[in-house]
Design a protein with these regions (language model features):
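Short helix/strand-bridging catalytic loops that position acidic/His residues to coordinate divalent metals
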Residues: 184-190, 220-232
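Sequence/structural segment immediately N-terminal to covalent heme-attachment motifs in c-type
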Residues: 71-107, 189-217, 238-240
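Surface-exposed patches in mature extracellular/periplasmic domains of secreted proteins
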Residues: 88-95, 151-156, 176-180, 253-256, ...
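Extracytoplasmic electron-transfer domains, predominantly the class I c-type cytochrome c fold
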Residues: 35-41, 54, 73-78, 82, ...
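Secretory-pathway/luminal and periplasmic proteins that interact with or process carbohydrate-rich
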Residues: 89-91, 107-113, 170-175, 272-279
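N-terminal secretory signal peptides that target proteins for export/translocation
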Residues: 1-13
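A cross-kingdom marker for long, charged
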Residues: 276-307
Length: 307
């Protein structure tokens, strides 16, 4: 589920207490349903006080042995299975051949590979792309609509509840609002990237797994075409794709590409045809679209250079 998120996060203390209570129910109590928390009243964080500091904590993946309740454990495991096998498990909601773990490596438990560790503790969160405060359900559905080129889950559904159960499990013990060492992707110096050079990188480093035309194979997902992520996905941004590629590709030699090679091949991949995203022009309605967003938005009338 990749997208450069704003550093401004909602610190809404009643919701923070609700998160703590929900996590206690989820991890520590006897079998109980964790009620979905829906609060759409707050859509503008400009009137809320900024915290004095944002706490940063160490990366830690919890053990399933910490879950005392068998019903909760079953929910966590089912959520993880949905994220591993998204296309086959949720075919009505997935419009391509990707799984959530195509991008979120090792079930979202790896540092600097867009992990889900601690993510539940960072929601609700103000996101500039929507110019509103989003719940974690909203963020998950954003990925279904964009990265999976599909349709959103019903927020109160069992599927959504189990996915959130897994993410909440990975966030157990993290303070509300805490930043986690190792969240997101590796930092690399932004470059324009060259698609001609990128084609060479793709041919020599990527094609063996992803296919001659980026169509994907049994061992690697499609990178463009109708079975890949759409233009509204975070990975459709060259900077995001380059950071992911730099850190984790090729999988038999992660980190072996230079920053320039990563940007070149990201530029090449994202210059190829892919599905459109209806409503993309409504992204970043208050402005501030990142420079590598390759489509026009209301806040920015001219698109970034796509090739």
């Amino acid at each position: 589920m990749p997208e450069e998120r704003t550093n401004t996060m909602l610190r809404h203390y009643p919701r923070a207490l609700a998160f703590t209570a929900a996590l206690v129910l989820l991890i520590g109590c006897r079998a109980q349903k964790v009620e979905m928390i829906r609060d759409t009243a707050v859509t503008d964080v400009s009137t809320l006080p900024e915290p004095a500091h944002v706490r940063r904590v160490a990366f830690r993946v919890p053990s399933e042995s910490e879950i005392a309740d068998s019903t909760v454990l079953a929910s966590v495991r089912r959520g993880r299975a949905l994220l591993r096998n998204t296309k086959d498990s949720l075919p009505r909601h997935v419009g391509n051949k990707l799984q959530c773990v195509s991008c979120h490596q090792a079930d979202g438990t790896t540092r600097l590979a867009m992990p889900w560790v601690g993510v539940y503790a960072r929601f609700p969160q103000y996101r500039s792309r929507a110019a509103s405060t989003q719940l974690i359900e909203d963020r998950i559905n954003d990925c279904f609509k964009r990265s999976m080129n599909g349709t959103p889950l019903v927020p109160e559904s069992r599927d959504m509840r189990d996915i959130i159960a897994y993410m909440a499990f990975l966030s157990s013990g993290y303070p509300v609002g805490a930043e986690v060492d190792g969240q997101g992707l590796p930092r690399i110096t932004p470059q324009q990237g060259d698609s001609t050079r990128g084609r060479t990188v793709f041919t020599t480093k990527c094609m063996v797994c992803h296919g001659t035309n980026g169509q994907g194979t049994d061992v690697a997902p499609p990178l463009w075409g109708r079975d890949s992520y759409n233009i509204g996905a975070g990975m459709a941004r060259v900077r995001t794709a380059a950071a992911f590629i730099k850190g984790w590709m090729p999988q038999n030699a992660p980190g072996s590409l230079s920053d320039t090679e990563a940007f070149d091949v990201a530029r090449y991949i994202n210059s190829q045809p892919r599905p459109d995203f209806r409503g993309k022009e409504r992204d970043w309605p208050k402005g501030g679209a990142p420079p590598d967003v390759a489509y026009r938005t209301r806040g920015r009338p001219s698109a970034a250079r796509a090739k």
